[in-house]
Amino acid sequence: MERHPASASSRQELGRLLEAVLTSRGQANAVFDILAVLQSEEPEEIEEGVRTCSRLFGTLLEREELFVGSLPSEDTALAGSQGATYKYKVWIRHRYHSCCNRLEELLAHPTFQVKELALKTLMKFVQLEGAKPLEKPQWESHYLFPRTLFRAVVGGLLTPEDDHSLLISHFCEYLEYDDIRYHTMQVATSIMARATSQQPEVSLTLWNNAFTLLSAVSLPLQECELTNFYVKHAQTSDKWKVVHLKEHKKAFQEMWLGFLKHKLPLSLYKKVLVAMHDSILPHLAQPTLMIDFLTSACDVGGAISLLALNGLFILIHKHNLEYPDFYQKLYGLLDPSIFHVKYRARFFHLADLFLSSSHLPAYLVAAFAKRLARLALTAPPEALLMVLPLICNLLRRHPACRVMVHRPQGPELDADPYDPTEKDPARSRALESCLWELQTLQQHYHPEVSKAASVINQVLSVPEVSIAPLLELTAYEIFEQDLKKKMPESVPLEFIPAKGLLGRQDDLCTQFFCLS
């Protein structure tokens, strides 16, 4: 939709009203005319009204002309016997509240420029109201933050009606401030809890908005004093929770646990699990509290289970969590479809990581090597070029499994003891089998696959082959590589020159036949 700037006359009128209110309290009623512009149906006029309100109440907050303390009702204050200054401050603070309420409504305006300007103005008021509090401190050095106003801002972002992902991305610029980040986590936790308590079925839009905001919150990894505040204070106190990283971690943990305890759509499950290992677990006060969520996700199956294993592995490896079924879950994910899923590269990267320990029992590694080899028989070439080096790496790490490569007294192929239907790798009898699948793949039609499968015909080198460059290999890339191969300038031909069709020396045909 085409936008037209507000007319010069309307800007001049708003400027005149602004100057009148700031110059003389006798002209205070002009505030109503300024606030009325916020109700306009023209986005350009609303923007001018928001800018005017920003300058007006920003100046009044700096001048400390708003009532401080528990705000009485407007009628009670005006009917009382207090002085004119008291009544004016109460009255102007009520107008300030009316302005903030309207700005909160504008966060849902259909025009993004209006929403963005309303957000910036509200955050400006948060900063000014924090520097010049509208409530009296309960004790000396009491930490004051405009929680009520800030809750309205975050509440305007986490709504079930509108997708605010773009507006939230602009709000995320404020999350670099320690106090904004801390209070955002607290307020978001409260809003999500209230939304789910009021209605059993929460809209997908609210969950998407919540995830967009939550995933943007990041904490420092190292313990440090937090002093980068959006609301400036003359001096900070060690008694304030907002200055301690451990309190931020507690708030971060409560926020995510409050989000993940609800039934989420599969699309959000995947997004959360993708971010779990590097954006969520490192910042939790007690990472092991995620075990219930991750084990439940592991039981879902498919890509959800695949992504949940990474978080479980971190809990096992770094936090000494016991989860005996981990490798059985991983083994169960190995089926023919794994070569065609969206997260194939991520899965095999993680599988390589999970199987990297040299302390794993030989029977377990043998089961994975055998399952991968069996799946390789029907895998596409781009997957084979990744899987075959992975199998060889498993044999390099675990010499006890190399018996599977060459077993002179092994069973016939039709009597392979390996049971591909067994879900428990310990009972699959893979170590009694052999990797005949790799010898079969040496006859593959693609020369690179045949070459990769032929590596087991020789002594395996000590250094492993990195599969990282092969994880995201595609059929298109293989085709392009084949096209770019340079052929030798001279093609090798027969070394004895031909003299006619039957012209070779000692050719029996020339002795008994004559072509004439």
Swiss-Prot record:
Family to which this protein belongs: Belongs to the CBF/MAK21 family.
Annotated localization: Nucleus membrane; Nucleus, Nucleolus
Name the record gives this protein: Nucleolar complex protein 4 homolog
GO CC terms: nuclear membrane; nucleolus; nucleoplasm
Signal peptide: none
Record InterPro entries: ARM-type_fold, CCAAT-binding_factor, Noc4
Transmembrane portions of the chain: 296-316, 347-367, 375-395
GO terms under biological process: ribosome biogenesis
Membrane topology, record value: Multi-pass membrane protein
Protein keywords: Membrane, Nucleus, Transmembrane, Transmembrane helix
SUPFAM superfamilies: ARM repeat
Pfam hit, one: CBF
